[in-house]
Amino acid sequence: MFLEVETHCHTIASGHAYNTLEEMVAEAKNKGLKGICITDHGPEMPGSCSSLYFYNLVVVPRKIDGIMVFRGCEANIIDYEGSVDLPESALNRLDFVIASLHDVCIPPGTILDHTRALISAIKNPNILCIGHPGNPLYEIDKEAVVKTAKEHNKAIEINNASFYVREKSRENCIEILKLCKKYGVYIAMGSDAHFKTDIARCDVTRKLIEEYEFPHELIVNKSLENFLEFLRLHGKNIE
């Protein structure tokens, strides 16, 4: 397996995914992973769960059948100031928060709007990763976003599902990957799995990483130790 930790996947709690948390963990084990982040959509996503779900993730065992389970969220950015749909009191209970722009939660604006939103989200200490920034619906100043991620030791996601469900994402993702290499910025390889068989699917992302010779030490989920070290950078000491 090219990566050891899945950093972006959804359960039935998201409202439009099809497996339980335990089924996702079991599939991660079947695929030889060592860890999985459960990153269900925040409450502004139609059909998703309430903030109480995220507060209560602390009851989920840290290990299930030998697989480390990280408590996460794909929070929805809900304005162009970078606010997300969970209070800080919920965010700071989680291990790995992704912030993303979704058109059902915020309408596309200008490049300046989108860039301001992502930069502001990056500056939030409880947000560790920007989700699918290659989405062509939300064009951004890629260099400004990547440089801000560098300043704050945050990760930029290269979202494998984008190559299949977000038309014209490829060119944006390649440019973002090149900029992350240029500036030494962390990336996360997210499958964005909404069904268990897609866990750890990174076929296109892996090809691009190999083609552009992206440093493996900057891939936060390449190994479990990489991921734990990335979390430690942000004050999260998980054993």
UniProtKB/Swiss-Prot annotation:
Source domain of life: Bacteria
InterPro entries: Phosphatase_YcdX_put, PHP_dom, PHP_phosphatase, Pol/His_phosphatase_N, Pol/histidinol_Pase-like
Example GO molecular function: phosphoric ester hydrolase activity
Record-listed E.C. numbers: 3.1.3.-
GO cellular component, one term: cytosol
Cofactor binding: number and manner: Binds 3 Zn(2+) ions per subunit.
Alphabetized UniProt keyword annotations: Hydrolase, Metal-binding, Zinc
Keyword Zinc set for record: yes
Positions that bind Zn(2+) 1: 8, 10, 74, 192
Sequence positions that bind Zn(2+) 3: 74, 102, 132
Positions with a binding annotation for Zn(2+) 2: 16, 41, 194
Required cofactor(s): Zn(2+)
Keyword Nucleus: no
HAMAP family for this protein: YcdX_phosphat
Family note: Belongs to the PHP family.
Listed name of the protein: Probable phosphatase Csac_1188
